[in-house]
Each structure stands twice: as structure tokens, then as C-alpha cells.
Swiss-Prot record:
This is Zinc finger protein 354A. Belongs to the krueppel C2H2-type zinc-finger protein family. It comes from Rattus norvegicus (Rat). GO terms for cellular component: nucleus. It comes from the Eukaryota. The gene is Znf354a. InterPro entries: KRAB, KRAB_dom_sf, Znf_C2H2_sf, Znf_C2H2_type.
Amino acid sequence: MAPEQREGASQVSVTFEDVAVLFTRDEWKKLDLSQRSLYREVMLENYSNLASMAGFLFTKPKVISLLQQGEDPWQVEKEGPRYFSLGLKCSHRTTKSTQTQDSSFQELIVRKSKRTFAFEPLNMKSENLFIHEGKLEEKWDKNTLTVERSHKNNEFSPKSHREKRSSECKKQISYLSNPPGITPDKRYKCSMCEKTFINTSSLRKHEKNHSGEKLFKCKECSKAFSQSSALIQHQITHTGEKPYVCKECGKAFTLSTSLYKHLRTHTVEKSYRCKECGKSFGQRSGLFIHQKIHARENPHRYNPGRKASASLSGCQRAHSRKKTYLCNECGNTFKSSSSLRYHQRIHTGEKPFRCSECGRAFSQSASLIQHERIHTGEKPYRCGECGKGFTSISRLNRHRIIHTGEKLYNCNECGKALSSHSTLIIHERIHTGEKPCKCKVCGKAFRQSSALIQHQRMHTGERPYKCNECGKTFRCNSSLSNHQRIHTGEKPYQCIECGMSFGQSSALIQHRRIHTGEKPFKCNTCGKTFRQSSSRIAHQRIHTGEKPYECNTCGKLFNYRSSLTNHYKIHVDEDP
């Protein structure tokens, strides 16, 4: 450091307050989820860095405890912030920069995170130091431990000075980051599995996998996580927030990785090319599936795995190494062996997770947890518009369409708009007549798997859905929901024409036909039309002569249940 630059420096102790940003309750409410996520990352990282530098025990600040537990950090106002001093000497650069009241959140966080720290081990000589914004470097003075905190100041750091120090920085970082005898990949080793990490914070995060320690708990569903970033990502499932928006089409996503995959649908980029025929693919899994065609044609000469690797550039291979576990059945790749094992259960049909209440089995533990909520009645996912609760995030997302009216997928046959691609596929089977889900017992086929599962309960006698009020059991959840409205008196389905309310959506659909005059059910014999399917079935008995309703008293037969009910009154009147 030049003498003229040293003159404005002063020595003070570093406290947690120096690297902390605190918000009032009102300020915290104004932050969106991405801003809160950034705040948590900066605060926890700063605390971790200071704690590792201190070398002795100290009281954990309340704001850090709140952040680790997933609580709102403004609650710390009740006690007042408590800070600890590391007892380190801090060189304050002379600065004229001030923090204005109208500074944006991003500027505030970046300003705090730019207060960087640098160390160098004892007996290492390093006369100069180039401060990196937002980076942590180690520098120890020969006799005293110093922490240099840089401020954004044009007078202190003119452009010429930055350029001059730039080349020096590159040399020093290589030396400071990698002291003699210590390789960058083997600084911090896990005692359990001997995996190595380049810094202590990464090692601590990894060790939580062995200890099972999960400090970050969701307030909505009580699910716990070992890392704050995982909790933040999980909380999005409750709020339904989708902060990652595609600039091309406006579609929103909960994860940045989902947005990245989606963006490739807009570009013509197809970076995975088959060397055999030249065909290109946007995703590596697509290339693997395609290469199986060539592998079947010439299995001795062609190796799908090797070809996939050879067809990528050096940079692409570096990215592709992240997914090293390949499914031999379908060609999909996965980041971990556990993810591959979960996936392979789709092909093997293995379902190791069984419900203790009804005996139903699942391939994944998450599916079992979601299913168990049917028995417990737990509904952790709540709609922000109407307050209605749901057992899964997918059901909540389907419900939200009622409020937003968003329907993105149109049927080419009838023009009907649907909210999801999977719903569109099931709907299209109405037009094609396709029924891929077949019952192995009686051979009856269905358009969707959920209908088949409900049907199979007729053969097994299984009725897993029980009413807590009267104990009556049902084969499907929707039947239970409809039944429970008898006890509650709830009628959520209202006709917009006359205001009449109904307990079931099917009853509302039938009622609307009174206003529209629609009669979609036609008799194939005489051409007469009906508003309800049951009315057509009853009418067709006139042509077939079928009389399924028999009087237990006199044995007389009837076409309609209502006719049998009226007939019973004759016997009631005859009784003395």
C-alpha cells in the first residue's frame, strides 16, 4: 500500500454489525422472495466467514438464529441487535461514499457484501493486495492479523489504480489461495467419507448430510432442511410464487433450472449432435434415446455412451459431467445414483413404500407422504385467494386456475382450452377413443390411470377414504369430499344465471343445461335427447323391455326407481 493511501486508514475492531444489514418490520414486508433469498445468503455467509476467522466461541447473534430457523429476521427488533467483536484489527479506507435513504435493496446488499476480507498465513510476504468485490481472500501480516475493508470510492480507487493492480492480483490470488504444500482441492476433508472441499463452509454443509442435522424448518408444513437455500426453494411450493419468468413468452417457473430448460425451446440451438447421422438434439437425453436406434442396428460397433461424449465440445463435456448416471432403459441421465434408482422403479414397477392405513404402495417416499395426508386430513398447501387447503402443490396449482382463468393448451378437435399439457392429452382421448389403461381382472379399459385405480377397488373391495363424522367409507377421495358436504351443508358450486347453489360440480353442470337447453344424450333407437345420462338409460328400457326395479311385497317390476317408490305407497296405505 502506498504511503499516501495509508494516511487515511484507521484501526478498529470488526464486529458482526460491520457486515450486517438489518431491516424493520415494514421494510422486510416490502421485499419479494428473491430479495429475501439474497439477504439470507449474504448474512449467513458473512456470519460463517467471521465465525471461522474468530477462532473462539461467542454468542450467536439473534438475527442469525432466526435466519437459520427460517424465521423473519425483523423479529430481532424486540430485543435489539446484539453483535460480537472478533478482536481483529480493521483498516478502514478513507471514504466519502454515503448510504442514501432511497438506495435500492440490491445496492444495499451489494454494498454490504463488497466489504471483503483478506488473509495470508504467517511468514508469507505479500506487500500488495488487490481487493475483489464480493470475494474472500486470505492475507496475514507478519506480526498482526488485519482485515481490510474496501469501500466504493472513486477518489481512492481510480480507474488507473485498478488497472495497475489488476495484474498483481492474479499472481497473488494464486499464491494466497494455494499456499505451498496445499492443493486447492484438498484443503478441507470430511472425516466420514474423506471427500474434500475448497472451503470450510462447503465442508460444514456437506457434514450435515452425515449428521442428519436439519436446522431450517418450514413454518407451513414443518418439513426441515439442512441448508437455508433448500428451505427457500421449498417455501415457493406453499406460496406458489414463480419468480423466474421467460422474457420470450412470459411463462413463469419456480426454479431457475426449469427456466433454463424452457428457454431452449425458443432457440434453435441443438448442441447434442449424433455423429452417425448428423441429427441434432436440444437435450442430452434426447441424443441418448436416438443413438439406441443405431446401437440396435450395429451393437458391436456402436457405443451410445462413448458417442454421446465424443459428439460434445470440451465445454459441453464439462457441463455434461454433472449428469453421470444413465438409465439403460430410456436413456435419461441423472446427477446422482439415488435419483437413478428412484427413476428405475418406473421401469421395474417396484413400490417399496407402503401405507400403514390402507396398504397402498408407492415407488417414492414423497408420494407416500402425500398419500398419507388423505388419512390424516392434513392440507398444508393453501390458496392465497380463497384460503382453501390441498394435500399437494399440483392440486393447488390446478385450483388456482379457477381464480386466474389461465388456460394455455387448446384442443385442435373441439377448441376446448385446458390448463396443462397432461390434461390436454387425457382430453384428446375422448376424440380418439383411446383407452390405454386396462383392468387385468375384467378387461375394462379407461382413458386415465386414476379411473382404473378407482375401478380396481370394486374388485378388491378397498374403500380407503373414511368420513370422520359418520364413519362411512368410499372408494375415491372425490366421493368422500362430496359426502362431507352433507354434514357441513356447504354448496360451493353456484349457477351464474339464477344463483342456485349445489354441493357437487356434476349437479351444477346438469342444472346449467336447463338454461342452455342442451340435451347431449341421444337415444340411438328413436333419436330422443336428454339432459342427463341417467334419463337416457331409463328411457332405453322402454325399447329393451328391461324392468330392474322389483317390489319386495308383491313382486311387480318397474322401469324407473321413482315408479317403484310411488308403488310402495299402495302397500303402506293398505297396512292397518
